[in-house]
A protein has these predicted regions:
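Flavin-dependent oxidoreductase catalytic cores
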Residues: 1-225
Length: 225
């Protein structure tokens, strides 16, 4: 954009600032306002941490109650936020559009490159926010064990968010209360991600239907890499 909403970071924050001023005014003292934001977009030319820290400072100054720290860009860097490999066979299996299915089969691994999974993969960047931002921060990304969650909370984060760990084991939080070494059984095949664009998100451990053999083999391959 070439107008007052594009170009410099200050201009690009203008619309956000206008919106958040109205949101905070409407919320008053009755509603807690959390903002989920990227620390990095995860692709060349996207926002990096120097700029997003400025965004966080602006949100803090606007009176936001907490920030949820994430990253990635679904259309350009989906695995930056999800981590691991995209299960291309699963993704195309559930597609109805024949030409899209064919195109993803041919170029999917180039279009959606793998980003290796590790526990708490956003923690290094999130700690930079923790040292600069005073309002509550909620950590998200790669939490699959009580031990790592305890580590994150001990670093000063007020709360954590989980997704795939709870898809894999809905009672995982209750098990963590009982077991100090609790760890979910998610194998990071990303089957749940592969199907979420066409049907409901679900872990392959909790399906009513039987998986086709080709998808079983893909899951086994990805989980044993």
């Amino acid at each position: 954009r070439k107008d007052e909403y594009g170009g410099s970071l200050e201009n690009r924050m203008r619309f956000m600032t206008i919106v958040m001023e109205e949101v905070m005014k409407a919320a008053g003292s009755d509603i807690a306002v959390f903002v989920k934001m990227n620390m990095r977009d995860g692709f060349r030319g996207g926002m990096e941490i120097e700029e997003t820290l400025e965004v966080a400072r602006r949100l803090e100054s606007l009176g936001v109650h907490a920030l949820v720290l994430s990253g990635g860009f679904v259309s350009k860097a989906p695995m930056y936020v999800m981590r691991g490999a995209m299960p291309i066979r699963t993704l195309t299996h559930y597609m109805d559009c024949w030409w899209l299915k064919y195109g993803v089969k041919l170029a999917g691994r180039v279009m959606i490159p793998t980003v290796p999974f590790k526990e708490a993969y956003f923690l290094e960047d999130a700690l930079k926010f923790r040292s600069e931002i005073k309002i509550p921060l909620i950590y998200v990304g790669g939490l699959v064990s009580r031990e790592k969650i305890d580590e994150v909370l001990n670093e000063g984060f007020e709360a954590v968010q989980m997704a795939r760990a709870l898809l894999n084991e809905p009672g995982f939080v209750n098990r963590m209360r009982r077991e100090e070494k609790a760890r979910c059984n998610c194998g990071h095949s990303n089957y749940c991600i592969g199907r979420m664009y066409t049907i409901e998100m679900a872990c392959h451990h909790h399906l009513a239907e039987e998986l086709p053999l080709c998808l079983q083999k893909e899951i086994e391959h990805l989980e044993n890499k």
